[in-house]
C-alpha cells in the first residue's frame, strides 16, 4: 500500500439525492490491504483486485484510491484477469438508464486507456458501455447496442491533477461531464442497450489483451441505475472529503478558489498552502493561481499530492 499524504482525520461523504435506491455500486478503496474493495452502496458488489498489478493509496477523494503504473499493470498475453473487476455486474441490468462517476489522476493520456468498462465484446466494444481516455487527451465514452452504437468525446483531461469524470445515459441520450460540466452529448435514434454479460472493469477492459493501460490513480467510483441530472453530477463533483463545496468560493480565505485547490491537490481548508511552492519553480501557489498557471507544472510528482480531511467519518 502506498501512502501519499498523511491524513489529518477520516473522510465524511454524505449521500447524494440519487444514492438511496439507485446507487448500484460505490468503491472507495479505503481498505488497508487485501484483494477486495468493499461496496459502500450496500449492494454487496465487492471489487476484486490483482494486488500484483495495482496498489492502494491512502489519501484520495472518497478516502482511498487504486494506483496503476501503466507498466506492471499490462495484462499478460495468456492472462484474462483484470487489475480490478466487479464480477457481480454480469447480472445487473442497466438497459433503461445509468450513470457512472469517478475521480482520476492520470500520469499519462494514452488513447483508449480504460477508466470504467463493461463489455462482453473485448475486441470491438460492440456491447455495454465504456468511459475512457479519448484521442488527444480528451475524455470519451460510448454506449454500444448493435447498429446504433455511439461514442462521444470532449474536453481535455489534465495529467498529474485530479479530474472528476462522469457519464449519464437515459436510454436515448448520452452525456459526458468533466469536473462537473457537460462537455459532450449524443442522442440515439432508437434505444441503445447498455447491457453486456460481463463484469465491470476498473482501469482495464476485462479480458482485453494489448489494451492501452491506464496510468495513474482512480478513486471514488460510483454507478447508479438512473441518469443523474446535471445538478446531481455537479453535486458529485463538489462532494469532496465530506462537504458540498462551492468551487468558486474560498473556504479558507487564502485567495485561491476551492475548486482550483481541489483540482491541483491542495487543501481548501488550509490557508497555509497559498505560500507553498508545490512544484519548486520559484512561484508560490497563490501566485500561480493568479497567473492562471498549474502549481504542479514545474515538477511532475511521482504520486498525487492529495487533500487532507479535517472531519470525522460519517457513512
Where on the chain are the PLM-derived regions?
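Localized edge beta-strand/strand-to-loop motifs within extracellular or lumenal beta-rich domains
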Residues: 161-175
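Extracellular calcium-associated, cysteine-rich motifs in secreted modular proteins
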Residues: 25, 232, 238-314
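Short, solvent-exposed beta-strand-to-loop segments that form ligand-recognition rims
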Residues: 51-54, 178-200
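Extracytoplasmic low-complexity segments
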Residues: 16-74, 123-125, 184, 233-253
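Extracellular glycan-recognition modules
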Residues: 22-24, 33-38, 73-140, 159, ...
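Sec-dependent signal peptide recognition
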Residues: 2-10
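Short, aromatic/His-centered strand-loop micro-motif at the edge of beta-sheets
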Residues: 141-164
Amino acid at each position: 500500500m502506498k501512502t501519499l499524504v498523511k491524513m489529518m482525520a477520516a473522510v465524511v461523504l454524505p449521500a447524494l439525492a440519487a444514492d438511496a435506491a439507485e446507487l448500484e455500486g460505490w468503491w472507495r478503496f479505503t481498505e488497508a490491504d487485501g484483494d477486495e474493495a468493499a461496496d459502500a452502496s450496500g449492494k454487496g458488489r465487492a471489487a476484486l483486485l490483482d494486488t500484483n498489478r495495482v496498489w492502494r493509496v491512502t489519501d484520495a477523494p472518497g478516502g482511498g484510491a487504486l494506483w496503476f503504473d501503466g507498466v506492471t499493470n499490462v495484462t499478460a498475453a495468456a492472462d484474462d484477469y483484470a487489475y480490478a473487476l466487479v464480477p457481480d455486474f454480469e447480472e445487473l441490468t442497466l438497459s433503461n438508464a445509468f450513470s457512472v462517476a469517478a475521480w482520476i489522476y492520470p500520469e499519462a493520456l494514452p488513447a483508449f486507456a480504460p477508466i470504467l468498462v463493461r463489455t462482453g465484446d473485448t475486441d470491438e466494444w460492440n456491447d455495454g458501455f465504456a468511459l475512457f481516455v479519448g484521442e488527444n487527451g480528451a475524455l470519451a465514452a460510448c454506449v454500444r447496442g448493435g447498429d446504433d452504437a455511439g461514442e462521444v468525446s470532449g474536453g481535455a483531461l489534465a495529467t498529474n491533477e485530479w479530474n472528476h469524470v462522469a457519464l449519464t445515459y437515459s436510454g436515448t441520450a448520452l452525456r459526458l461531464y468533466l469536473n462537473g460540466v457537460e462537455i459532450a452529448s449524443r442522442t440515439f435514434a432508437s434505444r441503445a442497450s447498455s447491457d453486456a454479460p460481463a463484469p465491470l472493469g476498473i482501469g482495464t477492459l476485462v479480458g482485453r489483451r494489448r489494451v492501452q493501460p491506464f496510468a495513474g490513480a482512480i478513486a471514488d467510483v460510483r454507478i447508479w441505475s438512473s441518469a443523474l441530472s446535471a445538478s446531481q453530477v455537479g453535486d458529485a463533483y463538489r462532494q469532496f472529503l465530506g462537504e458540498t463545496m462551492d468551487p468558486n468560493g474560498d473556504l479558507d480565505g487564502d485567495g485561491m478558489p476551492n475548486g482550483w485547490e481541489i483540482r491541483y491537490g491542495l487543501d481548501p481548508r488550509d490557508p497555509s498552502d497559498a505560500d507553498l511552492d508545490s512544484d519548486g519553480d520559484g512561484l508560490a501557489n497563490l501566485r500561480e493561481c493568479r497567473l492562471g498557471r498549474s502549481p504542479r507544472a514545474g515538477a511532475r510528482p511521482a504520486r498525487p499530492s492529495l487533500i487532507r480531511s479535517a472531519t470525522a467519518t460519517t457513512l
